[in-house]
Amino acid sequence: TLIGPKGLERVVNALRVIAPELPFPIIFKEITQNEQDFEVKGYHIHAFRVQHNVTCYGYTIQIPRAGRFHAEKAKELGIPLTFWSHLQKGETMTDGDKVYTPDMVMGEKRKEIKVTYVTDTRPLPIIAEQAKDADLFICEGMYGEPDKLAKAKEYKHMTFSEAASLAKEAQP
């Protein structure tokens, strides 16, 4: 699944001229709003518009995490080892008249993993808002030298120090 601005499918299909055969299908999801949410294979993806010379978005991806598997509890209950991975995936298993459910051996859900990714933009408040408490924040910084600030503003990019300031703001 590819998520991106309007015209994404046209651009990718033009590139497929050089790689027409792919071993997987491509599903396109075009962003039509300044902020938009998507659910893809259990992941929650929030796209948000950033400031660049062409339409560009940042993304926050939230990955849910199941609770920890309690192997000792599974052993105590006599659950066959071959069922363990199924129970960890949330599946109910039966063995004759015995029924084993995930809640018998799984702990509470753990904190989700949060990743925020932005590229090609000037600093914006929404970036720090989206990156707040992220486990990983990937942020562009096109110019390392402070004297390149005017160039960064002209071409709608960030300096390293601007990117670092956003990261600091996101992790109070």
Descriptions of predicted regions:
Residues 6, 32-33, 63-65:
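Non-catalytic surface loops within mature trypsin-like serine protease
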